[in-house]
């Protein structure tokens, strides 16, 4: 599809599951929030390449609508905050999502999709404010950072240490 000019830019069928701009609801208990279009690197296998170039404001201004949608759908028990890479957002945006979603009783699990532990681990271990946010909100809901290491050498000692320190 990628090299065929007639191929689909939406190879995973995301358009049919999009309920709001930046929110996909394919499976009843789960929503995917596309919180940013930024990444620390662009992966060869990425299926969201078509999103590169959208303004950050355009994606981030939808957070309140997304939180309202989740609040109105009690079947949703877990939220995957991704993008792009969710941890490329400023801490204020991350806190906006955490505060809004942690206030919803029927949410049990919040996941952040991020290759930051691989591509920019300093974003975690160099930012005490981010670590404090995770520590504070992990007391209210279960938090995970869902990441992907493509090769064992990508899993550095620093990455292992900081993932544990992040309380997620």
Descriptions of predicted regions:
Residues 25-59, 112:
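Canonical Radical SAM [4Fe-4S] cluster-binding loop centered on the CxxxCxxC motif
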Residues 33-34, 80-83:
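Short glycine-rich or small-residue beta-strand-to-loop segments that form or flank ligand, phosphate
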């Amino acid at each position: 599809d990628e090299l065929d000019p007639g191929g689909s830019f939406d190879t995973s069928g995301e358009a049919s599951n999009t309920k709001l701009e930046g929110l996909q609801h394919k499976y009843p208990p789960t929503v995917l929030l596309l919180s940013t279009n930024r990444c620390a690197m662009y992966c060869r296998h990425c299926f969201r390449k078509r999103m590169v170039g959208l303004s950050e404001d355009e994606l981030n201004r939808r957070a309140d609508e997304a939180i309202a949608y989740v609040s109105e759908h009690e079947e949703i028990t877990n939220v995957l905050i991704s993008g792009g890479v969710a941890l490329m957002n400023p801490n204020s945006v991350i806190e906006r999502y955490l505060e809004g979603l942690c206030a919803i009783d029927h949410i049990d699990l919040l996941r952040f999709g991020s290759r930051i532990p691989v591509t920019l681990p300093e974003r975690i271990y160099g930012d005490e404010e981010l670590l404090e946010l995770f520590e504070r909100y992990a007391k209210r809901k279960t938090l995970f950072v869902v990441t992907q290491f493509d090769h064992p050498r990508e899993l550095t000692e620093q990455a292992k240490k900081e993932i544990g320190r992040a309380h997620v």
